[in-house]
């Protein structure tokens, strides 16, 4: 799909980043890809991506007017987070002795499964995203735009859907 608009852009010898604000500006889709896919791969960009680099990208975004070429994409995933939570130190909640009396006093409860399903779709009408986390309880204002001709997301790229007032990342993924 092609979009002709003014959006935020940052680019250097390694990365091209574009931020697409949504609606009243509460949310944005941030897309990033290697500036030169022969010199840097998406895997290398992601491996080097940390909070400092992310903040550098976000603070250097400037308003540009350009043609944006972006493929339509849909991503879905389902992930069992039980082992992840145990690794993070959540242990007692999985034991039959867990204390969930604020949820139910009739039967002892414990967590048997934590599963997250995610969905994101990007097309001409915008972005649709949803996340469902299942916990199974078992008994027991824009500055003037600079002109950039075009930006084509025609090789592997990453995407981040974020909430703008806090910067919280809601979804992140890659399109190969």
Please give the residue ranges for each predicted region:
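Mature hydrolase/peptidase catalytic cores and their serpin-fold inhibitory cores, especially
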Residues: 1-176
């Amino acid at each position: 799909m092609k979009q002709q608009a003014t959006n935020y852009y940052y680019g250097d010898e390694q990365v091209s980043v574009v931020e697409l604000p949504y609606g009243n500006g509460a949310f944005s889709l941030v897309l990033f890809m290697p500036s030169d896919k022969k010199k840097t791969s998406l895997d290398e960009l992601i491996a080097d991506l940390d909070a400092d680099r992310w903040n550098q990208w976000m603070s250097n975004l400037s308003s540009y007017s350009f043609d944006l070429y972006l493929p339509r994409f849909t991503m879905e995933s389902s992930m069992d987070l039980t082992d992840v939570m145990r690794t993070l130190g959540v242990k007692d909640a999985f034991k039959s002795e867990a204390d969930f009396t604020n949820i139910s006093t009739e039967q002892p409860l414990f967590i048997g499964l934590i599963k997250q399903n995610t969905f994101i779709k990007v097309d001409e009408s915008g972005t649709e995203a949803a996340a469902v986390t299942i916990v199974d309880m078992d008994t027991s204002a824009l500055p003037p735009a600079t002109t950039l001709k075009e930006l084509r997301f025609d090789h592997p790229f990453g995407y981040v859907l974020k909430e703008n007032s806090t910067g919280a990342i809601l979804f992140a993924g890659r399109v190969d």
